[in-house]
């Protein structure tokens, strides 16, 4: 069992060329039981440090930094920052891991990637945990996220950056100062400013390009495609919803349970979008679903 993750890289392809995707790996590298944990839109694979540490006795846990984030390379063409490209990258990652099946833990965008992959014929996804995300996303929450996505923010100190991240992550719920630091330390990176070293965000600001190009027609078509993928999923699905979530509405969860094949749900109290799975009660949800423990 690893006390800390191993960092690996895999070469992926897009229409604009090759790019390296980083992944953080926990547990026995020979373990055939693999859990892939995929993060949210502006986050990194290090979001899963706590839950990966808890599960790596049973699983080889692999937490990628999706293209344009964290230790991964930025795409040459910002129009590639879309779910189909991310699904393609994950197929490459799973091939690198040399396994036929994986379980999937996807938070927000990571859940959309998981749905896209799990809904394919002959999918490698065995079980799918969707953390506060579904085929239908509340427009007001998407607008809230879009308001800060890609802004050229800079901070004079690391602590100033942490304070900003805590503010925009308030919907994560209550955390101790130590937990906030652990969650957000990887989101900041040192950058050269006009007056010396400053701190910026880890991700490519061009992530906002396809996000801001979206039209009502494109959003409707995307939602319909996600429902088709979701309804095609053959394996068990657990939908985890933050009770105060503004992104995944309670009625959407009910619709997912009704329209999916093997779908169950659980609601996490006192949390919005999205549960961070650093609290023991939240962490316990994952092994109960994946292993029955």
Curated annotation (Swiss-Prot):
Subcellular location: Cytoplasm
Stored SUPFAM superfamilies: alpha/beta-Hydrolases
Entries under InterPro entries matching the protein: AB_hydrolase_1, AB_hydrolase_fold, AB_hydrolase_sf
The protein's Enzyme Commission number: 3.1.1.-
Molecular function terms, GO-annotated: hydrolase activity
Entry superkingdom: Bacteria
Induction info: Seems to be expressed constitutively both in the N-rich medium (cell growth conditions) and in the MSF medium (PHB accumulation conditions).
Root EC class: hydrolase
Recorded catalytic activity of this chain's protein: (3R)-hydroxybutanoate pentamer + H2O = (3R)-hydroxybutanoate tetramer + (R)-3-hydroxybutanoate + H(+); (3R)-hydroxybutanoate tetramer + H2O = (3R)-hydroxybutanoate trimer + (R)-3-hydroxybutanoate + H(+); (3R)-hydroxybutanoate trimer + H2O = (3R)-hydroxybutanoate dimer + (R)-3-hydroxybutanoate + H(+); (3R)-hydroxybutanoate dimer + H2O = 2 (R)-3-hydroxybutanoate + H(+)
Observed effect of gene inactivation: Deletion of this gene enhances the deposition of PHB in the logarithmic phase in nutrient-rich medium.
Gene Ontology CC terms, in alphabetical order: cytoplasm; membrane
Main location: cytoplasm
Gene3D superfamilies on file: alpha/beta hydrolase
Keyword entries, A-Z: Cytoplasm, Hydrolase
Protein's UniProt keywords contain GTP-binding: no
Coiled coil stretches, renumbered: none
Membership in a protein family: Belongs to the AB hydrolase superfamily.
Other comment: Poly(3-hydroxybutyrate) (PHB), a homopolymer of (R)-3-hydroxybutyrate, is a storage material produced by some bacteria, that is used as sources of carbon and energy.
Function field: Catalyzes the degradation of various 3-hydroxybutyrate (3HB) oligomers at a high specific activity and artificial amorphous poly(3-hydroxybutyrate) (PHB) at a lower specific activity. Hydrolyzes the 3HB pentamer most efficiently than the tetramer, trimer and dimer. Does not hydrolyze native PHB granules and semicrystalline PHB. Participates in the mobilization of PHB along with other hydrolases.
Official protein name in the record: 3-hydroxybutyrate-oligomer hydrolase
The encoding gene: phaZc
């Amino acid at each position: 069992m690893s006390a800390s993750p191993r960092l690996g890289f895999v070469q992926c392809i897009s229409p604009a060329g090759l790019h390296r995707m980083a992944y953080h790996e926990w547990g026995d590298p020979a373990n055939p039981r693999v859990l892939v944990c995929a993060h949210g839109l502006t986050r990194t694979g290090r979001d899963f440090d706590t839950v990966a540490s808890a599960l790596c006795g049973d699983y080889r846990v692999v937490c990628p930094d999706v293209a344009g984030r964290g230790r991964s390379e930025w795409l040459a063409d910002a129009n590639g920052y879309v779910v189909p490209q991310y699904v393609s990258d994950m197929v490459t990652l799973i091939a690198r891991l040399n396994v036929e099946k994986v379980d999937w833990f996807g938070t927000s965008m990571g859940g959309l990637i998981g749905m896209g992959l799990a809904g394919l014929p002959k999918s490698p996804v065995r079980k799918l945990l969707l953390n506060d995300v579904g085929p239908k996303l509340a427009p007001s929450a998407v607008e809230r996220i879009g308001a800060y996505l890609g802004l050229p923010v800079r901070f004079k100190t690391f602590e100033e950056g942490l304070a900003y991240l805590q503010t925009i992550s308030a919907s994560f719920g209550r955390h101790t100062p130590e937990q906030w630091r652990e969650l957000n330390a990887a989101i900041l990176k040192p950058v050269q400013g006009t007056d010396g070293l400053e701190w910026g965000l880890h991700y490519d600001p061009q992530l906002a390009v396809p996000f801001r190009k979206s039209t009502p027609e494109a959003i409707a078509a995307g939602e319909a495609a996600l429902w088709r993928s979701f309804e095609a999923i053959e394996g068990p699905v657990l939908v985890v919803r933050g009770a105060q979530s503004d992104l995944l509405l309670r009625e959407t969860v009910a619709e997912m349970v009704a329209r999916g094949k093997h779908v169950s749900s659980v609601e996490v109290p006192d949390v919005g979008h999205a549960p961070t799975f650093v609290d023991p009660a939240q962490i316990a949800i994952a092994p109960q679903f994946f292993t029955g423990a």
